[in-house]
């Protein structure tokens, strides 16, 4: 059997004309630190709730972790206070001059469920509670709430705009459990996103116009601080 010879010079010249390493944009998605309402089991939605003592410690811990990694070119945040407070801590440690607020990164509006305790949602607002856990993605939650599709559309649009502005760069985005769940499900087309933990690190890459999950729900930096094991789970009723 004869050998197949390769023209090495031709092969080398061809490879020079091809970009072997695709440009990768890295977005580090962070869920805000624990709040008073998280700890109490209350449904926040778009209602403001402050970071509690544990949440403040979590913000410090995640800021210290990210400060030791590759420096981001920018820090973005939801315009809700719990996310902004977490983002400000990260920005300071990562030597970023400001936190850029993006309203479309805010938590899902969950209608008449907002302000209730999870344990009373099914009894006090059965229609809204059912809509929240429904697999019908275009179903809006009664009381002015958003459908899953509305949440996912604005969340992914915000992510796309950030990635477009920072091609080939690394940025940090601080947001919410519902937004993280929507992003995960849109990217993976999975049926469940599992638990979204406070102050978790979730990394996504955009390469060749395709989103890829690099790592998800990493809380290794919280070993000495602790976190709510139940997290946020929009797929399972409490």
Swiss-Prot record:
Question: What keywords is this UniProt entry annotated with?
Answer: Hydrolase
PROSITE patterns, alphabetically? PG_MUTASE
List the catalysed reactions: O-phospho-L-serine + H2O = L-serine + phosphate; O-phospho-D-serine + H2O = D-serine + phosphate
Q: Name one GO molecular function term.
A: L-phosphoserine phosphatase activity
Q: Name one GO biological process term.
A: L-serine biosynthetic process
InterPro entries tied to this protein: His_Pase_superF_clade-1, His_PPase_superfam, PG/BPGM_mutase_AS, PGM_Phosphatase
Listed EC numbers: 3.1.3.3
Instruction: Give TM regions.
Output: none
Question: Which cysteine pairs are joined by S-S bonds?
Answer: none
Q: Name one Pfam family in it.
A: His_Phos_1
Annotated catalytic residues: 32 (tele-phosphohistidine intermediate), 107 (proton donor/acceptor)
Entry protein name = Metal-independent phosphoserine phosphatase
